[in-house]
Amino acid sequence: MRQLASFLLLLCPLGAIAQTIDSDTTQTIKEVVVNGFRISGNVLASSPVQTLSHADMERLGIRDMGDALKRFAGVQVKDYGGVGGMKTVNIRGLGAGHTGVVYDGVQVGDCQSGQVDLSRFTLDNISLISLQIGQDDNIYQSAKSYASAGMINISTLQGYTDRNSQSTRKKTQLATTIRTGSYGLFSPSLLFHQQFSRLGIGAYGSYERADGVYAFKLKNGVKTINERRNNSDIETWRGEINLDYQLSDKQILKWKAYGFTSHRGLPGAVIYDNTYSAERLVDKNVFTQLFYENQFSQRIKLKAAAKWNYSWSRYSDVPASGYKEDIYRQQEAYLTATLWSEPLQGLHLSLAQDYAHNHLSMSLSQAANPTRNSLWTALAANYRIGQFTFNTSLLATNITEHVKIGNASDGFHRLSPAFSLQWRALQDLRLRFGYKDIFRTPTLNELYYTGIGNRHLNPEKSRQWNLGATYSHTFNRTLQLSLTADGYFGNVTDKIIAVPKMFYWQMMNAGKVRQIGLDISANAEQRWSNDWSLSVTGSYSMLNATDRTNPTDVFYGDQIAYTPRHSGSASALLHTPWMDLSYNMLLMGERYSLGYSIPQNRMTGFTDHSVTLSKNFRILKQQLRLQLDVRNLGNKNYEVVRFYPMPGTNWRLSVSWKL
């Protein structure tokens, strides 16, 4: 495989201003900009962590959250195609249920499916996306943050930033973007931030619509038929209001309100003799969260948050038997508090306590309409001595449930340990080792969904080991090279899968999976001046995730479904005085649509190539930005999910204005 090795990304340079003051007299001199580099967080961390800033995503032409996460090593994004297709994230073959999402410091949950659809988030107001695998170096976090094998952290913009992701520090900031493109895309957005002495007020709103109709080729044996993808339209509204109030020099209070509404068609799987689909999905989500932090001293601090979340969704279809409609409602109340202290030099301790109350109601007949109460308690420590950094944590989980109809599960109670160790062997070389024992609680659908739910399910258990090395060096102050490599081993037991019975399917603990893999990332950046630079980035993942359930099964040892053995990405960004030019490539190797590795289930690999051109203009102290993105230059209708063809070559034009 010629395409297995690649290189990884983009570090944002830091500008430093040097000033000189004469010892006898004061003189005013011009600013001198010194080119420098910021070391990637992945290089310094004791467990794998990868990040993308707002400036990175903008210049690379990254369109949505799924597109951003595809560039991280060890990540598979399940994309159902179309402009508004659902997107979930699978880390190292564990399944989307093992991936947590934190939005501005507070966990995002979905007790019904256990998976967060990342298509509901837009990138216009995102300042940073990070992916943490295993034990986090940051122990100043909520207890629930320890409850996932991997964590996606999303931070929103508080006002806008410059091309180096630095705040512009203006009191009044206003930015608007209008996008248009293929498939009837039209998407305006508005970002506002006003800073007073102690109070900050921010607002963000966006609208997106697209008809989603695109051509694709349908093959049946030797015949190829030209078809059009229909029922892939989408109309989405998003809005946020943020208030930040500095109570004192040591205390801050933050409040956020979020609203989301989406109406979209579900195009369904492509069937040779019937490409029609009438499935529709309406999603509505509202949440509000309050955050408080008090830094009592340099050695002790406390933060707490409260959140209320309401989600409503309606699925409808018109099958041969007549109109069908299902309505689901979720409500969540969530509380968290974390105390951090430094009792000794180099030793940090934290204690976190979280509580969540979830209720799910369904319009299905004989629906259980369950309620879940969850408690998480986490004790963590971080110790640094010499060239060593050690992190450890212990999470206690206690979950109880009750239902309106039938019998509830017995609940779930478990201790989950984790640790990581980093050794700085040389000035530029670090070695790291980590272990995490975690479990996934069965979702309310898996436990109580009418007809297939199983109240006797056990948690899905995961044990993960990681051994890696990182290297970063700057040559002649103009060239920086960063490399990371992580090998890992893991196993999943009591895997929850749907098992066929005599006349129906039922969720069962009937699976075991073993994972052996390697993640490599690399970044090289050459800076000749402020106006000229070149960044080359790449990532490569090898993953052997095989079924280890029953040695007598014919598919024992086969690769699990939708998990390629080889995947990767590469990017190159050239910054010039006239414009920025970027090239991106995504590689997905061969995989299987079912856990039985036979030719009928094989899905061929593909590469997706894209380019982005962007230009900034200064007009009357205001900034205007034009950007053109062209995706899928090969015009291939490849499939990420079987029978869900992706669009061919498509384009997007963006115009942004900042006051």
Predicted regions and their residues:
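Short, acidic, small-residue-rich periplasmic hinge/interaction motif at the N-terminus
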Residues: 19-58, 66, 96
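Extracytoplasmic beta-strand/coil segments of soluble accessory domains associated
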Residues: 66, 70-107
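A beta-strand signature from Gram-negative outer-membrane beta-barrel systems
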Residues: 120-175
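Flexible loop and strand-edge segments within Gram-negative outer membrane beta-barrel domains
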Residues: 210, 214, 226-236, 246-332, ...
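Structural signature of Gram-negative outer-membrane beta-barrels, strongest in the C-terminal barrel
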Residues: 248, 344-354, 358-359, 363-490, ...
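Membrane-embedded beta-barrel scaffold of Gram-negative outer-membrane proteins
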Residues: 303-315, 431-432, 460-516, 521-525, ...
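Gram-negative outer-membrane beta-barrel transporters
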Residues: 345, 483-491, 509-594, 621-623, ...
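C-terminal beta-signal and adjacent terminal beta-strands/loops
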Residues: 488, 587-594, 602, 610-659
